[in-house]
């Protein structure tokens, strides 16, 4: 990226697609950027949201499988480890800022809630719930930014745009 920012793709709502589709998208997207699968917590309590232990799949048929669901988040530990590795490798005395960028209703606020293990960002099932950007301190080294959904115009992300072109448009929107 032109500003030296690192991009990591989070394939959210992984529990809503068949295993074969998720694995194919993970393989494809990892050619461009580090990509991690994720499922946000759907627990109702406000604090101490639990995290699943690993990315496991439950066989449904002989040819395909579906996500072994539950209310806990899955993929959180891997994302936290990646963020902490980036933070440690930069060897900074201050915190790093991790922004969430995506279309409306893709789970940016839910991702932050799952990482923080607390309901720090308001969420709703309707698109456009997050109106302004807000910063959340994950710990003393990492600050998370929750952002409103970005809707790309045809000029910014034409059909068939590469991941690099979409990332550049998203970066421009965050400036």
PLM segments and residue spans:
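Short coil/turn segments at secondary-structure boundaries
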Residues: 21-23, 40-41, 48-51, 112-117, ...
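Helix-rich effector regions associated with P-loop NTPase G domains
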Residues: 3-6, 126-175
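Intrinsically disordered, low-complexity regulatory regions enriched in Ser/Pro/Gly/Thr
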Residues: 2-3, 27-30, 90-94, 103-105, ...
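Canonical P-loop GTPase G-domain recognition
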Residues: 2-8, 14-97
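Glycine-rich phosphate-binding P-loop
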Residues: 96-125, 147
């Amino acid at each position: 990226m032109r500003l030296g920012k690192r991009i990591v793709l989070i394939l959210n709502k992984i529990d809503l697609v068949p295993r074969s589709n998720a694995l194919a998208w993970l393989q494809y997207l990892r050619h461009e950027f580090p990509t991690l699968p994720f499922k946000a917590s759907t627990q109702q309590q406000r604090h101490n949201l639990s995290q699943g232990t690993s990315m496991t799949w439950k066989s449904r048929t002989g040819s395909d499988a579906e996500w072994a669901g539950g209310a806990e988040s899955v993929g959180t530990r891997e994302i936290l480890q990646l963020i902490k590795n980036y933070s440690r490798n930069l060897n900074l005395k201050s915190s790093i800022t991790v922004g969430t960028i995506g279309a409306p209703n893709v789970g940016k606020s839910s991702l932050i809630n799952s990482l923080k293990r607390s309901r720090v960002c308001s969420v709703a099932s309707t698109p456009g719930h997050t109106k302004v950007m807000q910063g959340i301190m994950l710990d003393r080294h990492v600050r998370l930014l929750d952002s409103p959904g970005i809707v790309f115009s045809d000029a910014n992300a034409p059909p068939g745009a590469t991941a690099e072109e979409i990332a550049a448009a998203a970066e421009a929107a965050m400036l």
